[in-house]
Amino acid sequence: MVLTNFFLRKKTSTTASIAKKRLHIIVTERKIDNTPELNYLPKFKKDLLRIIHQYIHEPKKISIQLQEQDNNAYMLQLTISFLTKNQDLINSKKQDNTTV
C-alpha cells in the first residue's frame, strides 16, 4: 500500500518550479506589452561618442543610427568616415609646414 501511495501521490511544487513559473509569467507579460526597454541607449550612445571623439576630432565623420528590426529587435549602426592615405599625407605635411 505504501508503495502505491508513493507513485500515485501528487508531487509538491519545489521552489525552483515556482520560480520558473513566475519567470515564465513575467516573460510572457513583457512580450505582450511590446514596450522596448531601451532606457540605456542614450547614455550608451553618449559614451560611445565620447570614446570615438578621443581619436576622431571631426564630428561630421561620425554617424550613429538606431534602427528597429523584426520582432522588436533593434540595431545600433555606427559609421565612421576615415581619410585615405593620400589625404593623411597631405594633412600631415600641412601640419609639419605650420609647425616649422
Swiss-Prot record:
SUPFAM superfamilies: Cell division protein MinE topological specificity domain. The keyword Cell division applies. It holds the Pfam family MinE. It comes from the Bacteria. The keyword Cell division applies. Keywords: Cell cycle, Cell division. GO terms for biological process: cell division; regulation of division septum assembly. Transmembrane segments: none annotated. Belongs to the MinE family. Prevents the cell division inhibition by proteins MinC and MinD at internal division sites while permitting inhibition at polar sites. This ensures cell division at the proper site by restricting the formation of a division septum at the midpoint of the long axis of the cell. HAMAP family: MinE. NCBIfam families: minE (TIGR01215), PRK00296.1 (NF001422). This is Cell division topological specificity factor. It comes from Blochmanniella floridana. The gene is minE.
